[in-house]
Amino acid sequence: FVEGDVEVRDEVLYYKGKHRLHGVVVDKLLDMLRSGMKDSTPITNYIGRLMNNPSSNSVDELYTFLGYRSLPITPDGKVLGYKGVQEDYWSNTGNADTIVVQGQTNDRHQIYNGVGETIEIQRRSCDDNKDNHCSHGLHIGSYDYANNWASSNGKLLLVEFDPQDAVSVPTDCDFQKLRVSKYKVVADISDSRQELD
């Protein structure tokens, strides 16, 4: 199997012929190949985006986050996740030291997460140490994690992030949360509170 920069030889996945890859995404691609996969484009696009991530630690940690639940991958290789925010779409917390590149903040340094908003911070404003559990950065979570943050009166959002913007997967919460430097709010699912397949 060869598609773009992704090649499978003897049940091993390579990127650009030399980088041997592993983890839940590789397992998923191999399973899809074994079952007569019809469209590998989302997975191969995801791998290409992942390999653009400047941190090898971030790449390895992202596998653990995606391994918790198979979060959906879009046709262009981005990943869908969840975010819990306040009823008025402002983040639950704010940080005066976070350098916001794109997005609206208030006087408490919270970030507005309305549908259609793209939120971006400088990558160095996002803690890359997975052992720092409650720390600075933009947080995305599994359905369960984000739904807990949304609580009964908050908003549960569907967000999309590029694997190249993943920074760290904190070791607490059973790898259910991820810190990123950028994401886009794609939908408010507060009324349905329905987890994607």
PLM region spans:
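An N-terminal, globular interaction/scaffold subdomain
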Residues: 1-13
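Generic low-polarity alpha-helical segments
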Residues: 6-7, 59, 138-139
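Accessory nucleic-acid engagement and inter-domain coupling regions
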Residues: 17
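ADP-ribose/NAD+-binding catalytic cleft of ART/PARP-like enzymes
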Residues: 20, 24-133
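ADP-ribosyltransferase catalytic core
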Residues: 121-193
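Long, low-complexity intrinsically disordered regions
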Residues: 195-197
